[in-house]
Design a protein with these regions (language model features):
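Intrinsically disordered, low-complexity
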Residues: 2-199, 299-310
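Solvent-exposed, acidic/flexible segments
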Residues: 178-185, 209-214, 248, 265
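Catalytic cysteine-centered active-site loop
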Residues: 198-251
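Aromatic- and glycine-rich peptidoglycan recognition patches
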Residues: 234-235, 239-247, 261-310
């Protein structure tokens, strides 16, 4: 049933792609059709986790899962249409009698007409971004559990280019002297390291739902007792911090990145907690450590910031 559900969802996507390709042919009422479409794709492990969470871990079949597939397909793919009308001119000729020459003559006319252009926008809202806006807290927790284990079916979608496999978290031992030098930083790390290995869940902000990047940083600062940030996004966390030059960054500072979500998303898009020696702990995929000297993080680095309380 898992593979059948994936096949059914992929079939819906193929139909949508065909609809976009043939939009002009299927809408002859427009003089011109312009289509701006996001890539049509989904991670099949995310789909499996959504279905399983919606059934609260109980058995399901393709037939019983179809309403869930339909619901999330409509949430994921949004098609909007707008029509503009332009005033254009065409050239026509007609025969007219010229009384001066007493002859019929061909006259060229510039005739106005309405030219309709249909602008079609297909937005892919990313299937993994939908649980937070469509599930209860309990169901989100179930979703996070399935994302952490892939339902113990890792490899079932082998060969699917959009299937993101489970990864082991990167581990790192913070030097004892670094922890001993700052009880505040030690409190942060005592809280942060509880969640190593938890999956990245868009919109997640608690151990029950797991975390996204800003949810993780917010939760760790708040529940370590260092500083109550509330639940903020990455940009909101940056606004709380005072700027710190990279050369003066200290363990416990927050490190911010930009451009990690691809084109079209401006500003700060990711954050983590700096732990010294060029390392950070963050909600990646999964929560773990990362080396800031890696080419990827260097290319997306935005700034360091220091929270109140540090």
């Amino acid at each position: 049933d898992v593979k059948a559900a994936e096949s059914a969802y992929a079939s819906m996507e193929r139909q949508l792609k065909e609809e976009m390709i043939n939009y002009a042919r299927n809408h002859p009422e427009y003089d011109e059709v312009k289509v701006d479409a996001d890539e049509i794709w989904h991670d099949p492990y995310v789909l499996m986790a959504i279905i399983s969470a919606c059934f609260d871990g109980q058995d399901w079949t393709l037939e019983t899962a179809m309403p869930v597939l339909d619901k999330y397909f409509k949430l994921q793919y949004i098609v909007t249409e707008s029509v503009t009308t332009q005033r254009k001119y065409r050239t026509e000729t007609e025969q007219r009698y010229n009384p001066e020459t007493e002859r019929m003559e061909t006259v060229t006319l510039r005739v106005p007409y309405a030219y309709t252009v249909c602008h079609v926008r297909l937005e892919n809202r990313n299937l993994s971004h939908l649980p937070v806006v469509s599930m209860s807290h309990h169901t989100m927790g179930m979703y996070a559990l399935y994302m952490a284990t892939h339902g113990n079916m890792e490899g079932i979608f082998h060969g699917n280019p959009y299937a993101v496999p489970l990864k082991d978290p990167m581990l790192y031992d913070i030097p004892d002297e670094t922890l001993a030098s700052s009880p505040t930083f030690a409190a942060l790390m005592a809280e942060a390291e509880k969640y190593i290995g938890y999956p990245y869940v868009w919109g997640g902000a608690s151990p029950e739902t797991s975390f996204d990047c800003s949810g993780f940083v917010s939760y760790v600062f708040t529940n370590s007792g260092v500083y109550n940030t509330g639940r903020l996004g990455a940009k909101g966390l940056r606004s709380l911090c005072r700027n710190v030059p990279a050369a003066q960054a200290e363990p416990g500072d927050v490190v911010f990145f930009e451009g990690t979500m691809g084109d079209g998303v401006d500003g700060i898009t990711h954050c983590g907690i700096y732990v010294g020696n060029g390392m950070m702990i963050h909600s990646g995929s999964p929560i773990g450590y990362a080396n800031l000297n890696d080419a990827y993080w260097k290319s997306h680095f935005h700034s360091f910031g220091r929270m109140p309380g540090l």
